Amino acid sequence: GVKKVIVSAPIDDPKILNLVYGVNHHLYNKDEHNIITAASCTTNCIAPIVKVIHDNLKINHGSITTIHNITNSQTIIDKPSSDLRRSRASMTNLIPTTTGSAKAINLIYPELKGKLNGHAIRVPVINASLTDCVFEVKQNTSKEEVNELLKEASKNKLKNILEVTHEKLVSIDFNHHPASAIVDASLTNVVGSNMGKISAWYDNEWGFSNRMCDIAETLHKIS
């Protein structure tokens, strides 16, 4: 029978390990974890950024907005539904909705529980999304330091998972990109000295699929 199951969606169960490759996959225990979740595409985009910022600057609070392309859970034309916004035509509207990504981050970083929240805006784009992260941090910082911390991580512990670009690109340029998050360094901003904004692009299908493969390979090697 099946010995290991990797779920490609969030699971709201504290007994199930929320595993984001490159961030906390070292927590996997072959004798304990037979079912794990790879969280979601957006969680995989946010988690590496949270790791870098929290490890180096300590996050006090944060708000996350994902500007997300449409998915097959939406409708082409308006239709009756209990979810009034998701029932509207997906290709002609910007649609505010919920995201479980911030909640999943809290499972990965319990010390941030109640300190991060967010929502999604579904936009009429076929593929590639953008996550906007705003953090209040304990340590004073600057735009240059934030970008340097992210760049350093992208070359070391988070190589091939987190990337940084200085190019003036748009969403379609990240179609079929294998990284979980590609930070747009030109959009990084710091206000005051401890309020920062980081924007990261991601292919919510292909990037996430690559991490699923990374997880499967890791489980195979360990098991």
Go through each PLM region and give its residues:
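Hydrophobic alpha-helical scaffolding
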Residues: 39-40, 94-96, 202
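A generic alpha-helix structural signal
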Residues: 50, 147-150, 216
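C-terminal substrate-binding/catalytic lobe of Rossmann-fold NAD(P)-dependent oxidoreductases
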Residues: 58-61, 66-196
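A generic structural signal for alpha-helix starts
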Residues: 44, 140-141, 206-207
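N-terminal Rossmann-like NAD(P) cofactor-binding subdomain of oxidoreductases
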Residues: 1-87, 190, 212-214, 222
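NAD(P)-dependent Rossmann-like dehydrogenase/reductase catalytic/cofactor-binding core
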Residues: 175-223
